[in-house]
Amino acid sequence: MRRIERCFQRLDGENRKALIPFVTAGDPVKDVTVPLMHAMVDAGADIIELGVPFSDPMADGPVIQLACERALQHNTSTRDVLAMVKIFRETNTQTPVVLMGYLNPVEVMGYESFAKAAEDAGVDGVLLVDLPPEEALEVRPVMDAHGLDMIFLVAPTTSDTRIKLIGEAGSGYLYYVSLKGVTGSATLNVEEVASRVETIRNLAQLPIGVGFGIKDAESAQAVSRVADGVVVGSALVNQIAENKNTPDAINDAVGGILSAMRKAMDQ
């Protein structure tokens, strides 16, 4: 059984939901990322989504775009990100790590060499935001052969037929984007999310993580009542931005938010 599936199975047995933080690798500097990953696990994270910096992150709002810029100022490459995961794995073999980013850096490395390097580093899944399932036919078998789950996005506007397709094409979990627009936008309508999650459950057999619009313990708790996982990104990346000149403060700032979310989700 793969690490992501095992994680959701364990949480299900404990009647708990997955807390899934997102941070951009190499933001604000490369040395911050691995200690931050450990700090997030200590604060209650179950799965880590690690952003691979890209020069044109079109699905992301200004907060995460700036995070990519900060990481790229230090030339954080895809291989650097894989090296970070490898170091993390030296002392943590349990927490799943998902690389989230865009197709271009994967194509540049080549599907096979990327998948092999990701497997060797201890990566568990890949979420490429600009790769729809219809276009993933070539990539999927390569990732699968190296034990990597392919995670796809479901939007509020996604049709039932397409949700079924995504459920069949993906593995690990589905990422439901709870708001129209870019990351870090607008406020969350939990009733709307609950209704959509129910629809998705009837069409796809994978656990459902919900992201976009989760900013605090209250919204994390509300979403955890209806989804299998809560994805939080911009709220954490904001803290990293605020502490970019004092990197030593980042672990506590991010950990504080996650601890509060974990506590609220477990109540």
Curated annotation (Swiss-Prot):
Query: What top-tier enzyme class does this entry carry?
Result: lyase
Q: What is its EC number?
A: 4.2.1.20
Residues at the active site = 49, 60
The annotated pathway is: Amino-acid biosynthesis; L-tryptophan biosynthesis; L-tryptophan from chorismate: step 5/5
Q: Which Gene3D superfamilies match?
A: Aldolase class I
Keywords carried by this UniProt record: Amino-acid biosynthesis, Aromatic amino acid biosynthesis, Lyase, Tryptophan biosynthesis
MF GO annotations: tryptophan synthase activity
Which InterPro entries does the record cross-reference, listed alphabetically? Aldolase_TIM, RibuloseP-bd_barrel, Trp_synthase_alpha_AS, Trp_synthase_suA
Query: What reaction gets catalysed by this protein?
Result: (1S,2R)-1-C-(indol-3-yl)glycerol 3-phosphate + L-serine = D-glyceraldehyde 3-phosphate + L-tryptophan + H2O
Keyword set includes Amino-acid biosynthesis: yes
Is the keyword Amino-acid biosynthesis assigned to this protein? yes
User: What is a single cellular component term in the Gene Ontology annotation?
Assistant: cytosol
Give the multimer and partner information. Answer: Tetramer of two alpha and two beta chains.
Family named by the database record: Belongs to the TrpA family.
| Functional note | The alpha subunit is responsible for the aldol cleavage of indoleglycerol phosphate to indole and glyceraldehyde 3-phosphate.
Protein name as it appears in the record? Tryptophan synthase alpha chain
Q: What is the lineage of its organism?
A: Bacteria, Pseudomonadati, Pseudomonadota, Gammaproteobacteria, Oceanospirillales
